[in-house]
C-alpha cells in the first residue's frame, strides 16, 4: 500500500482509481464514496492488522463508471500500470495519467456535444474582478474584468462547470455569486501577478500579451494564469491547442444582465415543459456550430457592419434553397471536428479519431469550392479560412488503415507496406509454422539428415532434433550448438533458429509496440497542423450557424430586418418565436405591430386582462431585437430597427427565499439595476411592476418608475410597461412620451374571449375573476368575488370608497371582529385616518409621504 499512499498524496481531494491488473481499485474513504455513487459492493481487506475499505470494478467498465463519479461532483485521478508485471519484480511501476474534474475533461461521454464545458477562474481586486474561461475540449480561452454585476452576468452566460478561486477569496466569492457553483481553491501564492504572467508568456511563447489585446487586463491575467497552472495539476501538460487568448469586450456586445438572460428564456425555459429561444434557432448540423450559436445568443453584436455581414450571408442562402440544403447535408457529415483536434496536443486521440480527421479533410474541398464561387463576402471569407491540409491527409492515408481499431493496444492500426519491420513481424505471426518448416527442409537438405525435425520446449525454445541414427556420422555442422542429449538422440539450436524463435515468440507484443511508436510519430507530425485544423473547425461552425439561420428563416417564415440611425423600432406583424411553435395544430399566432422611439412613443403603457398576452408582446419585442443583432432573420412581416445596446427585463416572480429575499425585494433589486444602467439605446421591459406589495404601494412605485424613465434627459430608454394598474393610464395625459395601449378582449355571455391584439388606448378591466373561473376555482368563491367586485365598483363610482360611513359597503360574514376595537390607541388613530381619507384625491407622491408619516407614528 506504500505506492498507493504515495499516489493518493499527490491528489488527496480526488478519488484515486488505482489500477491493479484488470481492475481499478479504490480504498478507504474513496471506496465508501465510490460504492455509494456507483452502487458497487464495498468490502474490506486486511492491511497490516487493520481492515481497510475496498471497492473496485473491471478496467473495461471505466467508460461507464467514470462519468457517474464526475457528475456526482467528484474529482477523479486515474493511476495506471506503466509496465507489465514480471516475476522478479514485486511492485509494478505506476503513475497518475489523468485527473478528471467537472471543468477539465476531453472525455466525450462526460461532455454535452452542444454545450461548452468551461473551467473558470475568478480573481478579486479592490477595483475590479477579473475572470477567465477555458474549455480544454475546444481550446477556447477568454478573459474579461469588471464590476461584480458584470462578472455575475458572465458567469450566468458562460455557465462554467467548475470555478477556480484562491483560498482566501472563498467567502467573498460566495457572498458575491452564491454557493451554487462547483469551486476549487488554490493556494494564494498562485494568484499573483508575476507567477501568472510568467505562465501566460511561457505558454504562448511571447514576450508580452499586446498581440492578444489583453496586455492591460492585469486582474484577469491573474485568473488566466491560474487556470493554466490548474490544468497542469490535472496532467494536461501540453495544451498547445489553447493557441490564443481573447478579450470579452463589453463595448462590442449588447449588455444583458443575468435577469434578462433568464427572463427572456434565451437558453433555458422557466417552465419544465417549455422551450427556449436556443431550441428554436439551433438547427445546426455540427456540435461546434451549436456551441458557437449559444455564444452568439448571449453576446449579441453592437457593430452594424458585423450584423449586416451575417444578415446578408443568411439572405444569400435563403433565396437559394438547393444550395442551402446541399451545404447542410455536407455539414452533417463532419461531426465534432473542434473537439477531435483538441485531443491531438493532449495525446488523447485514438486511431479511429485520426481517421475521422482525415475523412473530414477530404470533405472540406467541395465546401471550400462552393463558398469560394459564391457572391457573398462572408461566405467567400469562410472559404479562404478553410485549409485542406493535403500533406496531413496524405500522411494519415499512408499510415493508418481504413478499418483501424479504436485503441492502439490492439494491432491492425498501421497500413501494410509502411514499415518493413512491421510487415515482417506480421508475416511471422501469420506464417510462423511455414517459416519453421522452411528451416527444417533447408537444414535437412544441407546436412543429409532426412528425418530432421524441429521441436519446442519451455526450457530452451525451438530446437533441431537428430536421432541416434545420424548423430555419429559426421553430418552435424559446426555452427549447430548441442543443448540436450537423450536416449533417442540429440537436440541442437542455431543462430537462425533462435532469431526466428525470438521473432515468433515476441512478434505480437512487438507489433503492438511498433504500431504505437509509429502512431505516436504521426501524432507528433500532426502537432504542426493543430492551428489550421482549428481554423477549419471554426469556419465550419460559423457556416453552420449561418445556414441554421437561413433554414430557420425558410421554415418559420422569418424576414430580414433593416436598421436605421434614428432610434426607431417599428415592427409590423411581430410574433413570438417560441410561443408560435408551441401552439396547437391549426391555431395561428396573433401578430402585433410595435412602434417605439425616443420621443412621442418612448413608453408604451400596456394594460389588459390577465392571460391576454401582454407579457408575450413585451418579450417578443426584445427577442426580435436580439435575434436581429445576432444576425438572424426575425418573426415579423417587416422591421425597421435601431441598434439596441442594452436589454433590461423585469418580468415574472422570482423569489429567492433561500437567501431571505421575497418576491418584492428581488423585483426591486432587479428594477434598481435597470434604472442605474440606462442608455438612450436601451430597451426596457417592465411587466407588472409593483405587484409584490400592497395595491397603492405598487401603483405609487410603478407610477414613479414610469415618470423616472420618461424624464431622463440623455438616457431615454424605449420601454414597454405592462401593468394591471389601470390608474397608470393617466400618465399618458401628463407626459408626451407615454402612450396607452391595451390587449383587446371580447365579452360574450359573461365569457371573456382573448383577442390578443394590441390596440391604442387603455383598458379598465383585468377580468381576474374570469381567469380564476377558467382555472377551476370553486363556483362559490367565483360568485362571492363577483359580488364583492360589483360592490367595490359601485362604491368607487359614487365616491364612497374611503367614506367612514361605508363600513357595510361589502357584505361581511357574521362574527367578524372589528379591527379598530382590537387596536392600541396610536394604531387606532392611524386606522381611523386611513378610513376617513379619500385616496382618489392624492397624487402618488402624496401617498408615499403619507405612508412615511404613518410609519413614523407607528415606530416602524
Predicted regions and their residues:
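Charged catalytic and DNA/RNA-contacting regions of genome-maintenance
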Residues: 1-316, 325, 329-332, 336-345, ...
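ATPase nucleotide-binding head domains, primarily ABC-like/P-loop NTPase cores
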Residues: 28-31, 217, 285, 290, ...
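Short hinge/gating elements
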Residues: 44-55, 205-214, 267, 277-281, ...
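Amphipathic alpha-helical
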Residues: 78-95, 539-547, 554, 722
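Amphipathic heptad-repeat alpha-helical coiled-coil/stalk segments that mediate oligomerization
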Residues: 191-199, 255, 266-268, 359-434, ...
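Charged, surface-exposed helical/loop "interaction arms" that form contiguous linear patches used
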Residues: 346, 360-363, 416-417, 443-451, ...
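Extended, charged coiled-coil "arm/hinge" scaffolds of SMC/Rad50-like chromosome-maintenance ATPases
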Residues: 401, 486-524
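C-terminal tails and terminal domains of large nucleic-acid-associated
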Residues: 827-860
Amino acid at each position: 500500500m506504500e505506492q498507493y499512499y504515495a499516489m493518493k498524496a499527490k491528489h488527496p481531494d480526488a478519488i484515486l482509481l488505482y489500477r491493479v491488473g484488470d481492475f481499478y481499485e479504490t480504498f478507504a474513504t474513496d471506496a465508501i464514496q465510490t460504492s455509494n455513487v456507483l452502487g458497487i459492493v464495498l468490502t474490506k481487506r486486511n492491511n497490516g492488522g487493520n481492515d481497510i475499505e475496498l471497492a473496485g470494478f473491471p478496467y473495461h467498465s471505466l467508460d461507464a463508471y467514470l462519468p457517474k463519479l464526475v457528475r456526482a461532483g467528484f474529482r477523479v485521478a486515474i493511476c495506471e500500470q506503466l509496465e507489465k508485471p514480471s516475476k522478479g519484480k514485486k511492485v509494478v511501476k505506476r503513475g497518475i495519467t489523468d485527473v478528471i474534474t467537472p471543468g477539465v475533461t476531453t472525455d466525450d461521454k462526460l461532455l454535452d456535444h452542444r454545450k461548452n464545458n468551461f473551467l473558470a477562474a475568478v480573481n478579486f481586486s479592490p477595483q475590479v474582478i477579473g475572470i477567465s474561461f477555458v474549455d480544454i475540449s475546444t481550446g477556447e480561452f477568454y478573459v474579461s474584468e469588471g464590476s461584480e454585476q458584470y462578472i455575475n452576468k458572465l458567469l450566468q452566460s458562460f455557465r462554467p462547470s467548475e470555478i477556480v478561486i484562491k483560498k482566501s477569496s472563498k467567502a467573498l466569492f460566495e457572498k458575491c455569486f452564491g454557493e451554487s457553483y462547483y469551486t476549487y481553491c488554490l493556494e494564494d501564492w498562485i494568484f499573483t501577478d508575476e507567477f501568472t504572467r510568467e505562465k501566460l508568456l511561457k505558454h504562448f511563447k511571447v514576450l508580452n500579451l499586446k498581440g492578444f489585446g489583453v496586455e492591460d487586463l492585469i486582474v484577469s491575467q491573474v485568473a488566466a494564469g491560474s487556470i493554466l497552472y490548474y490544468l497542469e495539476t490535472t496532467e494536461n501538460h501540453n495544451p498547445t491547442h489553447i493557441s490564443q487568448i481573447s478579450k470579452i469586450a463589453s463595448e462590442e456586445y449588447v449588455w444583458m444582465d443575468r435577469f434578462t438572460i433568464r427572463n427572456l428564456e434565451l437558453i433555458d425555459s422557466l417552465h419544465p415543459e417549455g422551450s427556449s429561444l436556443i431550441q428554436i434557432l439551433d438547427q445546426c448540423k455540427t456540435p461546434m456550430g451549436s456551441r458557437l450559436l449559444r455564444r452568439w445568443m448571449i453576446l449579441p453584436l453592437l457593430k452594424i457592419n458585423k450584423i449586416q455581414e451575417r444578415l446578408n450571408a443568411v439572405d444569400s442562402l435563403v433565396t437559394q434553397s438547393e444550395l442551402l440544403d446541399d451545404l447542410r447535408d455536407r455539414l452533417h457529415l463532419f461531426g465534432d471536428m473542434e473537439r477531435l483536434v483538441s485531443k491531438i496536443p493532449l495525446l488523447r486521440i485514438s486511431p479511429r479519431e485520426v481517421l475521422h480527421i482525415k475523412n473530414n479533410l477530404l470533405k472540406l474541398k467541395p465546401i471550400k469550392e462552393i463558398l469560394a464561387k459564391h457572391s457573398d463576402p462572408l461566405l467567400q471569407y469562410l472559404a479562404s479560412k478553410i485549409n485542406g491540409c493535403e500533406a496531413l491527409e496524405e500522411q494519415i492515408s499512408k499510415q493508418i488503415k481504413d478499418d483501424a481499431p479504436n485503441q492502439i493496444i490492439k494491432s491492425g492500426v498501421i497500413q501494410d507496406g509502411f514499415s518493413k519491420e512491421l510487415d515482417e513481424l506480421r508475416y511471422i505471426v501469420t506464417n510462423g509454422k511455414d517459416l519453421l518448416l522452411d528451416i527444417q527442409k533447408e537444414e535437412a537438405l544441407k546436412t543429409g539428415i532426412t528425418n530432421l525435425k524441429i521441436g519446442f520446449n519451455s526450457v530452451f525454445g525451438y530446437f533441431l532434433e537428430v536421432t541416434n541414427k545420424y548423430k555419429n556420422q559426421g553430418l552435424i555442422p559446426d555452427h549447430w550448438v548441442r543443448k540436450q542429449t537423450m536416449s533417442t538422440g540429440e537436440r541442437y539450436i542455431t543462430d537462425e533458429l533462435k532469431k526466428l524463435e525470438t521473432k515468433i515468440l515476441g512478434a505480437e507484443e512487438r507489433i503492438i509496440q511498433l504500431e504505437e511508436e509509429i502512431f505516436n510519430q504521426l501524432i507528433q507530425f500532426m502537432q504542426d497542423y493543430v492551428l489550421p485544423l482549428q481554423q477549419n473547425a471554426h469556419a465550419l461552425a460559423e457556416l453552420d450557424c449561418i445556414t441554421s439561420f437561413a433554414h430557420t428563416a425558410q421554415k418559420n417564415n422569418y424576414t430580414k430586418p433593416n436598421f436605421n440611425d434614428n432610434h426607431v423600432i417599428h415592427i409590423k406583424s411581430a410574433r413570438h418565436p417560441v410561443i408560435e411553435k408551441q401552439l396547437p395544430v391549426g391555431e395561428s399566432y396573433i401578430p402585433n405591430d410595435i412602434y417605439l422611439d425616443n420621443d412621442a412613443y418612448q413608453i408604451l403603457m400596456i394594460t389588459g386582462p390577465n392571460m391576454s398576452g401582454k407579457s408575450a408582446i413585451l418579450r417578443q419585442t426584445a427577442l426580435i431585437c436580439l435575434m436581429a443583432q445576432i444576425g438572424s432573420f426575425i418573426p415579423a412581416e417587416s422591421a425597421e430597427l435601431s441598434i439596441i445596446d442594452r436589454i433590461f427585463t423585469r418580468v415574472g416572480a422570482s423569489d429567492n427565499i433561500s437567501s431571505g429575499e421575497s418576491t418584492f425585494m428581488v423585483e426591486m433589486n432587479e428594477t434598481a439595476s435597470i434604472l442605474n444602467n440606462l442608455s438612450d439605446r436601451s430597451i426596457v421591459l417592465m411587466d407588472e411592476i409593483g405587484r409584490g406589495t400592497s395595491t397603492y404601494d405598487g401603483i405609487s412605485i410603478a407610477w414613479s418608475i414610469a415618470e423616472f424613465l420618461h424624464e431622463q434627459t440623455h438616457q431615454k430608454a424605449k420601454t414597454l410597461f405592462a401593468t394591471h394598474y389601470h390608474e397608470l393610464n393617466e400618465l399618458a395625459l401628463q407626459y408626451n412620451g407615454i402612450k396607452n395601449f391595451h390587449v383587446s378582449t371580447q365579452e360574450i355571455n359573461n365569457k371573456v374571449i382573448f383577442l390578443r391584439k394590441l390596440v391604442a388606448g387603455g383598458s379598465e378591466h383585468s377580468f381576474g375573476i374570469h381567469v380564476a373561473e377558467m382555472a377551476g376555482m370553486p363556483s362559490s368563491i367565483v360568485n362571492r368575488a363577483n359580488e364583492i367586485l360589483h360592490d367595490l365598483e359601485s362604491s368607487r363610482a359614487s365616491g364612497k370608497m374611503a367614506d367612514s360611513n361605508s363600513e357595510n359597503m361589502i357584505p361581511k360574514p357574521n362574527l367578524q371582529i372589528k379591527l379598530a376595537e382590537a387596536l392600541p390607541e396610536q394604531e387606532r388613530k392611524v386606522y381611523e385616518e386611513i378610513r376617513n381619507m379619500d385616496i382618489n384625491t392624492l397624487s402618488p407622491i402624496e401617498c408615499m409621504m403619507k405612508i412615511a408619516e404613518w410609519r413614523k407614528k407607528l415606530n416602524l
